[in-house]
Regions:
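Signature of Gram-negative outer-membrane beta-barrel scaffolds
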Residues: 1-73, 83, 94
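Residues that define the transmembrane beta-barrel architecture of outer-membrane proteins
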Residues: 19-23, 54-56, 113-117, 162-166, ...
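Residues on the lipid-exposed face of transmembrane beta-strands in outer-membrane beta-barrel proteins
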Residues: 25-31, 60-64, 119-123, 170-174, ...
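Gram-negative outer-membrane beta-barrel transporters
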Residues: 32-37, 135-139, 158-255
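Repeated loop/turn-to-beta-strand initiation elements of outer-membrane beta-barrel proteins
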Residues: 35-38, 69-73, 127-131, 178-182, ...
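Transmembrane beta-barrel strands of outer-membrane/channel proteins
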Residues: 40-46, 75-79, 88, 133-137, ...
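Membrane-embedded beta-barrel scaffold of Gram-negative outer-membrane proteins
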Residues: 65-66, 73, 88, 108-159, ...
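C-terminal beta-signal and adjacent terminal beta-strands/loops
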Residues: 236, 244-269, 273, 287-292, ...
C-alpha cells in the first residue's frame, strides 16, 4: 500500500535557480583594565535570497578575576542573526510545491533573530582541580527548524514564532594529578518552541498546525552526563575510560484518531522493529535514557628524533545500548547511534 496521501501526484519534478547573496562586516575590540576583561563588538549582516533583510548585532563579554579566591566571574550577551537553511528552499517556496496536496500552508521563511545570555564562574581548587559553571538563556524569534516532503528524505527549512531555551552546565576538570587526568560534566537544559508557524511548507494535514501553544524543542535533553579518566601507566603507555548518560530527546508521535495508541505502536513495530520501539516511551513522548561506557589505550611504539609512531585502541558503546538518538515525528527523521564498536589507529609524525 502507498504511504502517500491519495491526492499526491505520482510524478513531480522541479528545477529552479536564484542567487544567494549574503554579506557581513564586524568590528571588535579586547580591553584589559586591571582584573577586568571586556570584549565588545558590532556585526552587520545582509541576507538576500527570497527575502531581503539586514541586521545589526551587538555582542559583549565581561569577566572579572578575583586573585584572593582564584575565581573568575563572567557574563556575555550576543545578538544573533541566523539565515534560513538554503536546502530546497526554492522548492518549498514554489507554486509547484503547493500543488502537491490540497490544504497546503506555505509561508516565507525569514531569518532567525535571537538574544543569547550567559553567566558563570570558574574556580581553581588545590592547584589540580578546576570547576566551571554556567547558566544560559536563548530567546529566538522565527525559530528555525526543518520539515520533510511526505515520506521522503527531502527536507526544507521552516520556522516557528519563537523559542525559549535555558539551562545550566558544570564541569569538573583534573588536568594532571599523580598520573591521573580527567573530567566530569553535567548539563541541564529546557527548550520550548512556540506556535504558530511563521515560515515554511506544510503539506495537506500538516497545514492544520495549532496557532497557539508550545512543544519541546528537538534538542530538549534535560540531563546529560559525560566523564572520562586517563591514567599514565608508563612514559609511553596510557589507559582511559569514559561514561556517557543521556535522558533522551523528545519526539512528536502522530496516531490516527481511528486507532488506539497500542494499535498505532504496533504499526510502528512493523516499520522500525521491536528493538527500536522498546527504546521509545510513547506515554511521555521521549526516548528512554541511555548509558554508555567507552575505553581506550595508547602507546608510543617508536620514538626517535625524526619519527614518532603511536598506536591507539578504542572501544565505544561497550554496554552495547541500542542508542536511539531521534525518533520519527512530524518534524524529524530517525537517527540511531553505532552499536558496540572497536577501532585501531596507527599514527606517524615526522
Amino acid at each position: 500500500d502507498s504511504q502517500f496521501d491519495p491526492s499526491t501526484p505520482t510524478p513531480f519534478s522541479f528545477a529552479g535557480t536564484h542567487p544567494d547573496i549574503e554579506q557581513s562586516a564586524f568590528v571588535q575590540d579586547l580591553i584589559h583594565l586591571g582584573n577586568w576583561t571586556v570584549s565588545a563588538g558590532l556585526r552587520w549582516d545582509h541576507y538576500h535570497l527570497l527575502l531581503d533583510q539586514n541586521a545589526v548585532d551587538p555582542r559583549l563579554s565581561i569577566s572579572r578575576y578575583f586573585h584572593s579566591a582564584d575565581l573568575v566571574l563572567h557574563f556575555s550577551y550576543d545578538r544573533v542573526f541566523q539565515t534560513p537553511s538554503f536546502e530546497n528552499i526554492l522548492l518549498s517556496s514554489s507554486t509547484a510545491a503547493t500543488n502537491l496536496q490540497t490544504g497546503t500552508l506555505q509561508l516565507p521563511v525569514r531569518p532567525s533573530v535571537g538574544n543569547y545570555f550567559e553567566a558563570g564562574l570558574t574556580k581553581a581548587f588545590f592547584k589540580n582541580l578546576r570547576l566551571s559553571t554556567n547558566y544560559f538563556r536563548r530567546d529566538v524569534n522565527n525559530y528555525a527548524d526543518d520539515n520533510q516532503v511526505t515520506n521522503t528524505t527531502i527536507g526544507f527549512p521552516i520556522a516557528f514564532q519563537k523559542a525559549i531555551i535555558y539551562g545550566a552546565e558544570g564541569k569538573l576538570d583534573v588536568p594532571d594529578w599523580h598520573r591521573f587526568s580527567g573530567f566530569l560534566s553535567y548539563s541541564w537544559s529546557v527548550g520550548n518552541a512556540f506556535y504558530p508557524v511563521t515560515g515554511g511548507l506544510f503539506l495537506g494535514a500538516q497545514g492544520m498546525i495549532p496557532t497557539s501553544g508550545h512543544f519541546p524543542d528537538s534538542q530538549d535533553q534535560r540531563n546529560t552526563v559525560r566523564g572520562r579518566v586517563r591514567y599514565q601507566v608508563a612514559s609511553r603507555l596510557w589507559v582511559a575510560a569514559g561514561i556517557q548518560y543521556d535522558t533522551g530527546l523528545p519526539f512528536q508521535f502522530q496516531c490516527d484518531s481511528r486507532l488506539t495508541l497500542q494499535q498505532c505502536i504496533q504499526g510502528e513495530v512493523q516499520t522500525y522493529g521491536q528493538q527500536v520501539i522498546d527504546r521509545i516511551n510513547f506515554n511521555l513522548g521521549r526516548i528512554y535514557p541511555s548509558f554508555q561506557v567507552s575505553a581506550s589505550a595508547g602507546a608510543d611504539v617508536y620514538k626517535s628524533e625524526h619519527l614518532k609512531m603511536s598506536l591507539q585502541i578504542d572501544g565505544q558503546n561497550l554496554t552495547n545500548v541500542l542508542d536511539v538518538i531521534d525518533f520519527g515525528g512530524l518534524f524529524s527523521g530517525n537517527a540511531i547511534g553505532p552499536p558496540r564498536s572497536y577501532f585501531v589507529r596507527l599514527a606517524a609524525t615526522f
